[in-house]
Regions:
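Trp- and S/T/G-rich repeat-edge/linker motifs of beta-rich repeat architectures
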Residues: 1-21, 28, 32, 40-103, ...
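Calcium-coordinating acidic loop motifs
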Residues: 110-111
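A structured beta-alpha segment of the ubiquitous adenosine-cofactor-binding alpha/beta core
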Residues: 231, 284, 360
Length: 463
């Protein structure tokens, strides 16, 4: 299990740009670590998203790709529906970045790839793109904007399965409005040759149900690829396919109604295979409330789904379900007994141990005057059997403003941990009299060791 005493920060303060807030995607390629960073806005050259490379031996970072700039137009000013007061303000005449983030990243060898290549999905108001690199130095665009629909803001997980690459769109921009978490195309896409930009729809929209408004996560388990939806009316659903024949494939539903919690389990935020079962982390955005759909407040749950369709409640709210009485096997209520853990954002398997990382909004309690001093920070919990969980950290490794974990990547050098840092909250806390170093802004990346390695590493997809 991870030993917090071995934690080493290998990147901080946004790694050269404190406006780089989210360590959004990550992969090991040709022995080096690649990191895609995201900015909450794209107001000028200072918000151009970057892909960085870390050399484990030298211990240094290199910027290998920076988003190009483009002239600002109406899409640059799109009103963000999640934020009061409208959309983004362009502050530079030099232009705005085409990409303000890189959301998905994986190593994959398609039909025309001579060797495995690094594929990256972008966040762009002009339609998310897929980038490809064969050497980790040059990145080329290998897709149409939005895979043919430039209203699609980005793509979440890039998941290899049975020689094909799968992804799902997230975010939409239409009629001057930006929706970061929804989509106008809740569909799984597939390609056996992404280098040629050839993509097909692998599913019906919403799997045939319009209430499945978004497909958040994909993960393989055995002979099936599983997909987790967001369904604000009835609760998340889990679907699976063997991906046989020509797309769109045949899919079957294996879990619905938010595993019996209905809309309080509106969305699947993370999935990973561990010891022959699929582990599912749920969540609601922000402070655990979706005001647009009048859902919440609620904290995240952790659920274990078996290949036969039966499920176990591990962390969550006791209840009766179609499977009978469900009592959390970890003996912990939603959010690992912490109501501020609104989302399970990342999971991975490293050295035979399951790691679960959260989004924690506790810092807002201070900003709302509910606590005397800033407190909070993401949680990481660990389990060797999927039922008995031990905390690795419950305070963001001492940083209350590190609200969440966006990357968990097992490597031979340790577990890579990348954060989502709300630097603007540091400014607000300082204005309210807190003893806060406002210069400590921007994402951070750390390596943490397990002194007793064993088992095969697996990571959940990004998004």
């Amino acid at each position: 299990m991870l030993d917090p005493a071995t934690l080493t920060r290998i990147g901080s303060h946004g790694i050269g740009n404190p406006r780089s807030r989210v360590a959004h995607s990550c992969a090991v390629f040709k022995g080096r670590l690649y990191l895609g960073v995201t900015h909450p806005n794209g107001e000028g050259p200072e918000d151009a998203a970057r892909i960085l490379r870390y050399d484990f031996g030298a211990g240094d970072w290199t910027v290998v790709h920076t988003s190009p700039l483009r002239p600002a137009d109406d899409r640059a000013f799109a009103a963000d529906i999640l934020r009061a007061g409208g959309g983004r303000r362009v502050v530079s005449e030099a232009g705005v970045p085409r990409e303000r983030g890189f959301r998905g990243m994986c190593v994959f060898q398609g039909a025309s790839d001579a060797e495995p290549a690094l594929y990256v999905s972008t966040i762009s108001n002009w339609g998310g793109l897929i980038l490809r690199s064969t050497d980790g130095e040059a990145f080329e665009v290998v897709s149409q904007p939005g895979l043919g629909d430039d209203r699609l803001l980005s793509f979440r997980a890039l998941v290899p399965f049975k020689g094909k690459l799968f992804t799902t769109p997230i975010g939409s921009i239409s009629e001057g409005r930006l929706d970061r978490n929804g989509t106008i195309e809740p569909t799984v896409f597939v390609s056996d040759d992404p280098a040629q930009g050839t993509w097909s729809k692998a599913s019906l929209p919403g799997f045939g149900d319009a209430r499945n408004g978004v497909i958040f996560q994909l993960a393989p388990l055995g002979e099936h690829l599983y997909a987790g939806t967001g369904n604000m009316e009835r609760g998340f659903e889990i679907w699976r396919t063997k991906a046989e024949g020509a797309p769109p494939y045949a899919w079957e539903r294996v879990l619905d109604r938010g595993a019996g919690r209905f809309s309080l389990n509106a969305s699947v935020a993370a999935m990973v295979e561990f010891d022959g079962a699929l582990y599912i982390g749920t969540g609601l955005p922000g402070l655990g409330v979706d005001r647009a759909h009048d859902v919440g407040p609620a904290a995240a749950e952790l659920i274990r789904l078996w290949p036969d369709g039966k499920f176990d409640l591990l962390v969550g709210e006791p209840r009766f379900s179609a499977s009978g009485l469900q009592v959390p096997l970890a003996a912990m209520l939603p959010g690992f007994d912490d109501a501020a853990n609104s989302v399970i954002w990342r999971m991975c398997v490293y050295n035979g141990t399951l790691y679960v990382a959260t989004h924690h909004w506790g810092i807002y309690n201070f900003l709302m005057g509910k606590t005397a001093a800033p407190s909070g920070g993401f949680h990481i919990w660990a389990s060797t059997d999927g039922e008995d969980f031990t905390p690795v950290t419950t305070d963001g490794f001492g940083d209350a403003f590190a609200v969440g974990i966006r990357t968990l990547v097992p490597t031979e050098h340790g577990l890579v941990i990348g954060t989502d840092d709300h630097g603007v909250l540091r400014d607000r806390a300082a204005r309210q009299g807190a003893d806060v170093d406002v210069s400590e802004k921007g994402l951070s990346v750390a390596l943490c060791q397990d002194p007793s390695p064993h088992g095969e590493p697996r990571l959940g997809p990004y998004g």
